[in-house]
């Protein structure tokens, strides 16, 4: 799914959450909200993104060509949007040199990015959603190791 579609869905869900919290009375349990007859079935969200038509075409094999290659793993959770997030795991502790051999004089380290996801609620409020931060490993990079000299 594209960034644009993901952003639109996240904004839609956040808008619904705000409307629900501001216009709905409490249900049987104090933590859950119940819909009344004026509860909106849909919400229109206007999203303004700069450089809307900019397309970024990149090679899809960075994970193999990098001096710090990684493998992508599917992280799937049906109670989260997006339900599938691809995460990287560094293949080696060291880095690949020009000859294609692993050099342990350098370190392969993960690159992490914090993203926002929407999580579906469960008992006692199954029809609720909450926004959460998630730390995702998006790739790996090669760095010089930190060396501590013992005097």
Curated annotation (Swiss-Prot):
Keywords: Cytokine, Disulfide bond, Early protein, Glycoprotein, Secreted, Signal. It comes from the Viruses. Its main location: secreted. GO terms for molecular function: cytokine activity. Belongs to the IL-17 family. Disulfide bonds join 90-140, 95-142. Pfam families: IL17. InterPro entries: Cystine-knot_cytokine, IL-17_chr, IL-17_fam. Residues 1-22 form the signal peptide. GO terms for cellular component: extracellular space. Glycans are attached at residues 36, 53, 64. It comes from Saimiriine herpesvirus 2 (strain 488). It is found in: Secreted. This is Viral interleukin-17. Coiled coil: none annotated.
């Amino acid at each position: 799914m594209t960034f644009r579609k993901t952003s639109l869905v996240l904004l839609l869900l956040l808008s619904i959450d705000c409307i629900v919290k501001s216009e709905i009375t409490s249900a049987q349990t104090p933590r859950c909200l119940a819909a009344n007859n004026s509860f909106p079935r849909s919400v229109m969200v206007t999203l303004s993104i700069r450089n809307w038509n900019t397309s970024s075409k990149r090679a899809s094999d960075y994970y193999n060509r990098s001096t710090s290659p990684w493998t992508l793993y599917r992280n799937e959770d049906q109670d989260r949007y997006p339900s599938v997030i691809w995460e990287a795991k560094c293949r080696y502790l060291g880095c690949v040199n020009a000859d294609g051999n692993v050099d342990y004089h350098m370190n392969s380290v993960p690159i992490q990015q914090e993203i926002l996801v929407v999580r579906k609620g469960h008992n006692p409020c199954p029809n609720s959603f909450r926004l959460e931060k998630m730390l995702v490993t998006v790739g790996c990079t090669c760095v010089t190791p930190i060396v501590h000299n013992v005097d």
